[in-house]
Regions:
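OB-fold and OB-like single-stranded nucleic-acid-recognition modules
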Residues: 1-255
Length: 255
């Protein structure tokens, strides 16, 4: 009979954010509240306030309020329809040219900060992130280098029993940006499964996405086949933003 190994204590990756700025707007998402924060360095960040409260205490927040927040990063799923894609462009009139487009649905992800503590009032300008995790993939755009980091922190959801008595967990994912492929003037070379701990700041990168790419993601690219001016429709573009951790220092752990 094979002896059973004793359970192993769980070890969690680091995942923390400290940030301050002014509330730009607020909106409801079910029982939760989402906030757009205008940060001192010109960045904008999305915050998630679970159940519209902190530790069960209701809050009073308004546009323009200066706040300081501590929390952690997650990727929040949301759905976008073809109708919403065209509404962003002010081109709902095109729905008649592409039957079925309004019903197409694409599952997307948005990076946000889950708020654990919040102070209202002027504060020292702050935008600090510490995250640790396993590199899932890397890519490059010109001289810029990026990585997707899988973070197994104490806030991750469990999904059944894993090995040696530990629960199986679903990672949080965040994107890292290494400006010019460097950290502190040193070139960075990464590969999948590298274990990193980074210090950085939150930043948004703007990009455009075509209707053709949206439909390809959503499995509805065939809808354009019979549409008039399908080529021009395919190239209709909407503006997107993606949130990254801009890496300012790096620890690359060895096994």
């Amino acid at each position: 009979m094979t002896p059973q190994l004793p359970p192993v204590e769980e070890k969690f990756h680091l995942n923390s954010v400290r940030i301050s700025g002014a509330v730009q707007r607020l909106w409801a998402s079910g029982t939760d509240v989402l906030l757009r924060l205008s940060v001192h360095d010109g960045e904008r960040v999305t915050l998630l306030l679970p159940n519209s409260s902190l530790d069960g205490r209701p809050l009073t927040l308004m546009k323009g309020d200066p706040i300081s927040v501590a929390g952690y990063l997650i990727e929040m799923p949301y759905l976008e329809t073809g109708r919403q894609f065209l509404e962003h462009l002010g081109r709902e009139d095109l729905l008649a040219d592409v039957p079925g487009l309004a019903q197409v649905v694409d599952k997307r992800m948005a990076t946000c900060v889950v708020v654990q503590s919040l102070q209202i009032g002027e504060a020292i300008p702050t935008n600090e992130v510490v995250v640790e995790g396993i590199v899932a993939r890397t890519w490059e755009k010109g001289e810029q280098r990026f990585a997707r980091l899988a973070i197994y922190d104490r806030h991750t959801e469990t999904d059944g029993e894993g090995r040696r008595g530990r629960p199986r967990r679903k990672a949080h994912y965040v994107s890292l940006h290494f400006p010019d492929g460097q950290v502190n003037g040193r070139k960075v070379t990464l590969k999948a499964r590298d274990h990193l701990r980074v210090l950085g700041r939150l930043s948004e990168r703007r990009y455009s996405e075509s209707l053709g790419y949206f439909l390809m993601r959503a499995g509805g690219i065939g809808l354009l086949a019979e549409a008039p001016n399908s080529d021009s429709l395919r190239e209709l573009r909407t503006q997107r933003v993606a949130t990254y951790v801009v890496v300012e220092s790096l620890l690359m752990f060895t096994k």
